[in-house]
Amino acid sequence: MDDTGAAPVVIFGGRSQIGGELARRLAAGATMVLAARNADQLADQAAALRAAGAIAVHTREFDADDLAAHGPLVASLVAEHGPIGTAVLAFGILGDQARAETDAAHAVAIVHTDYVAQVSLLTHLAAAMRTAGRGSLVVFSSVAGIRVRRANYVYGSAKAGLDGFASGLADALHGTGVRLLIARPGFVIGRMTEGMTPAPLSVTPERVAAATACALVNGKRVVWIPWALRPMFVALRLLPRFVWRRMPR
């Protein structure tokens, strides 16, 4: 076990833009763990966290789609670094909606990464944190899951499922000492959406990370990014279906 005395912050999806930006905002005085595929290629990300004031930075191999490895990974992190202080689930894929409409395997792959893998990892993390009696979980949902649109219904349905699961898990964790924060960003301008036309109220990974870090510090349960999306989606959920199905992305 580490002898730094700092409860580790673990970023699952340590190569993601939002995960990296959030990690930098949480790094000062913390023991950081970046978990991602090809963990031996995370030197630049690790260096950025050291520059941001991390006490120590570790990397771990992590394949979100390898569900059988989730439990052993969480157990080994706790054994090596002590109870996890904050776990951020920053992995996910957008996929190709057009392809997913005719390629069932691709549709399932999107849902597997964006929903099934998240459920698996959250379940293992929540159990470990319950045992410790403390900890924080950060889940990245999306406004795409608040009311699923025809233009991205595969990705949107996965996010809808994740949002529902995380909301229920947050309620189940009430009173245990474990908190769960759901971040609901709008369209994020970054690598995942490169080449796409930004939607109204688009945000950057930096803005998403800043808002999420602030919400985490303030003990919020849900954060909409930007905040104006919340009243917008209250209205959008009331639109008749024949109007909604004509909505662009």
Swiss-Prot record:
InterPro entries: NAD(P)-bd_dom_sf, Sc_DH/Rdtase_CS, SDR_fam. Substrate binds at S142. It is an enzyme of class 1 (oxidoreductase). The active site is at Y155. Its EC number is 1.-.-.-. Pfam families: adh_short (PF00106). NADP(+) binds at residues 11-34. The keyword Oxidoreductase applies. Keywords: Oxidoreductase. GO terms for molecular function: oxidoreductase activity. SUPFAM superfamilies: NAD(P)-binding Rossmann-fold domains. Belongs to the short-chain dehydrogenases/reductases (SDR) family. This is Uncharacterized oxidoreductase MT2133. It comes from Mycobacterium tuberculosis (strain CDC 1551 / Oshkosh).
